[in-house]
Amino acid sequence: MKHFEFENDKLIVLDQRKLPFEKEYFVCSTYQDVYIAIKDMIIRGAPLIGIVAAYGVVLGFKEIIEKNMDSAKIYEILNYLANSRPTAVNLFWALERMKKVFEEARNLSKSQIYSLLMQEAKKIEDEDKSINKKIGEHGNTLIKEGANILTHCNAGALATGGYGTALGVIREAFFAGKNIHVYVDETRPYLQGARLTAFELSEDGIPNTVICDNMAGYLMKLGKIDCVIVGADRIALNGDTANKIGTYSLSVLAKHHGIPFYISAPISTIDFNIKSGSEIPIEERSEDEIRFFNGKKIVPDESKVFNPAFDVTPAENITAIITEKGVVFPPFEENISKLKEK
């Protein structure tokens, strides 16, 4: 199933809020539509957010041409898209790449600039697919035959340009013939695990079991989990990692039970400008995502709601970070810095 495609000057994205029971597409004709797709979680996952934002810049520059606006309008478009979601660093990384292309080409004709922006967006997309495969290959070396793997949220093809980061590792292990089983946290409140990860695994024939988030510790105590693999939305220089809310709790449980805890992410998810997780902004989303379930109110009006979308897992709880350039072990600050030099 194609989950996004740019064709006929439109970006068409699969509405992931409707999966797995409805297959509905959202058409982005303008950069404002792209903002909505990111902000409202029609699409999600740090790498995919970056790709979609890049195509948003393309749509924005198309509008500049059609309305005969000054090319400098692109800076407003870049800032607008940057405000869609604050935590995933791939968003800012992709927008910075698009900005650089524009600034190097700004003396060319608008049509030439448009072509170069389109080429860069496609390049970001194509690179991500290749990067995911490499992440999977490196991560597969950590997966033992017969491993029971726990994952959280969705870090699969639906969250990336294709194949996935955490699920890329799982796919590589499965396709290599390893007899693995995946436990999938449902991942409240958006249920990305139950709706998306279980869907992807089932489509590939990978054995999986969906569990409620609060069951993970019990499974670990029973000896049913051999490792935990999750994705990431932003990684600090010291290895602290922001990922879907609930990841921190899993890391604490895994550390207590002596279970390896792996982060799987492209180098573009590393923010080399921040030293620790304390500098990562944590997005808070609408109370209604918790107040309502399947369109029905389940929380009393008198009760307050706290709905952070992410938490930060400290580096000391992380066994290794799997990237396209290899597996990074502690000391993270030293070894992450080396990645930039490679």
Curated annotation (Swiss-Prot):
EC number in record: 5.3.1.23
Which catalytic residues are annotated?
Answer: 233 (proton donor)
Name the enzyme group at the top EC level. isomerase
Q: Identify one Pfam family in the record.
A: IF-2B
Q: Quickly give the catalysed reaction.
A: 5-(methylsulfanyl)-alpha-D-ribose 1-phosphate = 5-(methylsulfanyl)-D-ribulose 1-phosphate
Entry binding sites for substrate: 44-46, 85, 192, 243-244
Question: Which InterPro entries does its entry note?
Answer: IF-2B-related, IF-M1Pi, IF_2B-like_C, Initiation_fac_2B_a/b/d, M1Pi_N, NagB/RpiA_transferase-like
Listed A to Z, the keywords are: Amino-acid biosynthesis, Isomerase, Methionine biosynthesis
Question: What residue ranges are annotated as transmembrane?
Answer: none
| Superkingdom classification of source | Bacteria
For the site labelled Transition state stabilizer, the residues are 153
Q: What does this protein do?
A: Catalyzes the interconversion of methylthioribose-1-phosphate (MTR-1-P) into methylthioribulose-1-phosphate (MTRu-1-P).
Query: What is the protein name stated in its UniProt record?
Result: Methylthioribose-1-phosphate isomerase
Q: From which organism does this entry originate?
A: Caldicellulosiruptor saccharolyticus (strain ATCC 43494 / DSM 8903 / Tp8T 6331)
Q: What gene is this protein a product of?
A: mtnA
